[in-house]
Amino acid sequence: SADGGLSKRMFGSLLSWMQDHRHPIFLVATANDISALPPELMRKGRFDEVFFVDLPDKEARKHVLKIHLKRRKMNPERFDLNQLADHCEEFSGSELEQVVISAKFAAHQENTPLADKHLIQEMQNTRPLAILSSEKVRQLRQWAADRCVSAD
């Protein structure tokens, strides 16, 4: 394998630890592609529930934008978060972060304060992975609908 077997050894150690550990524990793990995980990791008793976290809805996108604006010392109240959230459907949280970073850079190049127009322009320039890989996202959503608990 590309990692020299590190992943296999790591999963083996995790499975052994989960099997041997007798105290009550609450273990949370995340995966971008659950189909790539070994099936023995997914059986009941190891992970009793699998939750599906979809891309952020409008309210979540507004919240994510607010977080990333604040992190960059911007007052989110200066922006029309409703309008901005309408322009970035199917964006992931990390894609929204990059929109804010790129828009701030573009505004700096113009020697103007960051404004909605900069953010919207960056959103229009961004092709989110969910659009570029729409078939894969559709399949993942279908798989999750049949097998997972919605995290919403």
Role assignments for model-derived ranges:
Residues 1-85, 91:
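Walker A/P-loop NTP-binding motif of AAA+ ATPase domains
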Residues 77-100, 109-152:
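C-terminal engagement/docking regions of AAA+ P-loop ATPases
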Residues 103:
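C-terminal anion-handling pockets and recognition modules
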